[in-house]
Amino acid sequence: MSFSQKYFQENEFAIRDKKLKYYLSPTLLENNFKHGFFTKTSSEINLLLLSNRLKLNNKNCVLNQIHSNQIVFGSKTEEKQREEADGIVCDKQNQNLWIYTADCMPILFADKRKRLVAAIHCGRKGLENKIIKKLIKIFVIKDAQKKICLSQ
């Protein structure tokens, strides 16, 4: 059992909705960010159906994750034409960021004041190539505060 699964179980942040099971971060909830960390079973559900079920718009920002240190802005991504990268930064309101992980770490950054959110798929190669440092630099340029919300 991963640290985040154990943490969420102990703090009762697991949500179950028939086939859909996901976890919520207390930090993101306190700051009114819509979010969810989904299980493998949930990933089998079509992204548009998942967005509708969670009452999200259909502005899904999805990546073709390549185990790199590449970071893109959400407006460059579309579900049908995925950018090759492992990090994504919201640059418009109401964008849905989607990151998939197995043995890599999902890491979220958020700034309540700027309403800026970023997600990275952090594996060994991305970590070695300083993807986290690269994302922090983007937050500094955007005058955002850096706060890691969750890492597995």
Feature-to-residue mapping (PLM):
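Active-site microenvironment for binding and transforming phosphate-containing groups
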Residues: 1-152
